[in-house]
Each structure stands twice: as structure tokens, then as C-alpha cells.
Amino acid sequence: LDYDHNDCDNRERLAEQHRMFYHTVRAAHPDIPIIIMSAPYAARTFFQSHPAKSRAIIRQTYQNAVTAGEWVYFIDGGMLFGADKDVALVDRIHPGDIGHLKMAHAVLQCFEDIAKHGRSQHFRKGDIH
């Protein structure tokens, strides 16, 4: 789920809509792993004046799912690029080649964990990639 990019300055609306969207997907697919990713930028932008607050809302959906025992992963978009954020985002908003590569690597880590552990007792619920 990648949801919070263009409509996230209204915190209450984002929290409610993100929660509802997650539950809609989960209801339709109760037995699959879901990867939740927050927006992959950390600086203020035209679309997002407080990205850390939006990430906290997205993370709360994830935490609620973990608490409920659901099969879910979280990718913190604010941590994706590290020191490379200036080259990963071509205009401080949109990922370029390096940004997409780092995003793909984070998702691949989730896929590798799913392939290796499935939803067995070895699954590390709550891990943040």
C-alpha cells in the first residue's frame, strides 16, 4: 500500500482513509502479506508540509495490523534513501533511477523474507524494513 503522497495535509482524513483502505484490501485478501510504504521523501514539499506526521499515521495503521496478528510489513519512506536522498529524488519529490532502485531493494527484502519464512512461527512480525 502506497497511499499518502498527494492528499496528506489533513491528518484526520489521512488517518481515516488510510485505515479504511487497509481494511478494504485486507478484507478482500485475508491471507496475503501486505507491504505498507510511507512516502519516500523527508523534506517539506508542496504536497506534504509535515512528512513525519504523515509517516506516523501510516505507521499506526501498520502497528494496529501487527497487534491484530496480521501479516504485514512496513517500509519507512523517510529512511529509504539515507545519505543519498539528494540524488535519489530528482526534484525532492519524485524518485529517479537511484530512488527507484532503493525502493525496489526495500520491497525485495520483504519478498525475500516472505519466501524464506512464509507465515510460519519464524516470521518476524513487527520488523520494519
What positions do the PLM features span?
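Alpha-helical cap/lid subdomain in secreted, periplasmic
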Residues: 1-129
